Amino acid sequence: MQLINRGFISVKPSSLFIEWLKSYDSTVLITAEDAEATVYLIEEEFWDDALILKTYAKKIATSTFAEYGCDEAHWPSNFDIENFEQWFDCDLGCTCIDLLAAPIQ
Protein backbone atom coordinates (compact mmCIF):
# COMPACT_ATOMS: atom_id res chain seq x y z
CA MET A 1 0.00 0.00 0.00
CA GLN A 2 1.20 3.45 -0.83
CA LEU A 3 -0.26 6.87 -0.14
CA ILE A 4 -0.44 8.87 -3.37
CA ASN A 5 0.11 12.60 -3.20
CA ARG A 6 -3.15 13.51 -4.93
CA GLY A 7 -6.67 14.48 -4.01
CA PHE A 8 -9.62 13.29 -6.05
CA ILE A 9 -12.97 14.19 -7.52
CA SER A 10 -15.30 11.22 -7.93
CA VAL A 11 -17.88 12.06 -10.61
CA LYS A 12 -21.03 10.09 -11.37
CA PRO A 13 -23.58 11.15 -13.99
CA SER A 14 -26.88 12.15 -12.39
CA SER A 15 -30.33 11.25 -13.68
CA LEU A 16 -30.47 14.64 -15.49
CA PHE A 17 -27.35 13.77 -17.49
CA ILE A 18 -28.72 10.30 -18.30
CA GLU A 19 -32.05 11.81 -19.43
CA TRP A 20 -30.20 14.24 -21.70
CA LEU A 21 -28.00 11.42 -23.00
CA LYS A 22 -31.05 9.32 -23.88
CA SER A 23 -32.62 12.29 -25.70
CA TYR A 24 -29.39 12.57 -27.69
CA ASP A 25 -29.07 8.82 -28.33
CA SER A 26 -32.20 6.70 -27.94
CA THR A 27 -30.16 3.47 -27.97
CA VAL A 28 -28.61 4.26 -24.56
CA LEU A 29 -29.69 1.68 -21.99
CA ILE A 30 -27.81 2.91 -18.93
CA THR A 31 -29.65 4.28 -15.91
CA ALA A 32 -28.35 6.73 -13.31
CA GLU A 33 -28.25 3.86 -10.82
CA ASP A 34 -26.05 1.78 -13.15
CA ALA A 35 -23.66 4.57 -14.14
CA GLU A 36 -20.19 4.19 -12.68
CA ALA A 37 -18.23 7.02 -11.14
CA THR A 38 -15.00 8.24 -12.71
CA VAL A 39 -12.22 9.35 -10.38
CA TYR A 40 -10.09 12.34 -11.37
CA LEU A 41 -6.85 12.93 -9.50
CA ILE A 42 -6.18 16.53 -8.53
CA GLU A 43 -3.87 18.47 -6.22
CA GLU A 44 -3.51 16.84 -2.83
CA GLU A 45 -4.38 19.81 -0.67
CA PHE A 46 -7.32 22.08 -1.31
CA TRP A 47 -9.59 24.04 0.97
CA ASP A 48 -12.48 25.17 -1.18
CA ASP A 49 -14.53 22.41 -2.82
CA ALA A 50 -16.58 24.91 -4.85
CA LEU A 51 -13.44 26.50 -6.30
CA ILE A 52 -11.99 23.10 -7.18
CA LEU A 53 -15.20 22.07 -8.96
CA LYS A 54 -15.32 25.38 -10.82
CA THR A 55 -11.68 24.93 -11.85
CA TYR A 56 -12.15 21.42 -13.26
CA ALA A 57 -15.83 21.36 -14.31
CA LYS A 58 -15.20 22.05 -17.99
CA LYS A 59 -12.48 19.39 -18.29
CA ILE A 60 -14.60 16.83 -16.46
CA ALA A 61 -17.74 17.59 -18.48
CA THR A 62 -15.75 17.40 -21.73
CA SER A 63 -14.27 14.07 -20.68
CA THR A 64 -17.67 12.68 -19.66
CA PHE A 65 -19.44 13.76 -22.85
CA ALA A 66 -16.65 12.11 -24.86
CA GLU A 67 -16.72 9.00 -22.66
CA TYR A 68 -20.39 8.51 -23.55
CA GLY A 69 -19.76 9.14 -27.26
CA CYS A 70 -21.49 12.51 -27.47
CA ASP A 71 -20.58 14.55 -30.54
CA GLU A 72 -19.28 17.95 -29.45
CA ALA A 73 -21.74 19.67 -31.80
CA HIS A 74 -24.59 18.33 -29.64
CA TRP A 75 -23.20 19.29 -26.24
CA PRO A 76 -25.41 21.71 -24.35
CA SER A 77 -24.58 25.33 -25.09
CA ASN A 78 -23.72 27.63 -22.20
CA PHE A 79 -22.84 24.69 -19.95
CA ASP A 80 -21.75 26.29 -16.67
CA ILE A 81 -20.92 25.28 -13.09
CA GLU A 82 -24.61 25.30 -12.10
CA ASN A 83 -25.43 22.86 -14.90
CA PHE A 84 -22.41 20.79 -13.95
CA GLU A 85 -23.56 20.45 -10.35
CA GLN A 86 -27.02 19.35 -11.53
CA TRP A 87 -25.79 16.88 -14.13
CA PHE A 88 -23.04 15.24 -12.06
CA ASP A 89 -22.83 13.95 -8.50
CA CYS A 90 -19.38 14.74 -7.13
CA ASP A 91 -17.43 13.73 -4.05
CA LEU A 92 -14.07 15.29 -3.25
CA GLY A 93 -11.33 14.02 -0.99
CA CYS A 94 -7.64 14.34 -0.31
CA THR A 95 -6.58 10.78 0.48
CA CYS A 96 -5.64 8.34 -2.30
CA ILE A 97 -4.08 5.01 -1.44
CA ASP A 98 -2.75 2.59 -4.05
CA LEU A 99 -3.46 -0.94 -2.83
CA LEU A 100 -1.39 -2.62 -5.54
CA ALA A 101 2.34 -3.27 -5.52
CA ALA A 102 2.71 -2.70 -9.27
CA PRO A 103 3.68 0.85 -10.30
CA ILE A 104 1.01 3.19 -11.66
CA GLN A 105 1.29 3.69 -15.41
Language model features with spans:
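Extended, charge-biased low-complexity segments
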Residues: 1-44
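Amphipathic protein-protein interaction modules
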Residues: 42-104
